[in-house]
């Protein structure tokens, strides 16, 4: 999604890609701590088969910057193709709320670290609701709804076989 949309200058799709990247990689670093990040996903293009591990602080700094950038990329002039948007059906406002709510979640995770300046950043979000819209009700949640009928049983496709996930093989093309 992101590579094609960069060429087309679809800033909303770029913002969504940054948001989903932050969601997935924040979950990974929360589970595993330090992990490959800066050199991750460069095996094919740059032949880095054993990426070095980065500190969790470096990862969080980068993800928070990505979310800040994503928040500024959303525009009402650029549309999101509702057929490609499985979570919000093309609603830019809901995507922006998701991005900023995720931003708050990550700031809360690092709230005990003074060097991350999370208290000031959290305060900025709450004091500027027009600049940083956030979830206000359950209607804003990012919920993937399964229809239960073919071909719409699992919209993300079958990515696992015998408990082995193949998502990591396709992730570089998505990002």
PLM regions: where:
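A short, hydrophobic C-terminal helix/tail in secreted or cell-surface proteins
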Residues: 170-175
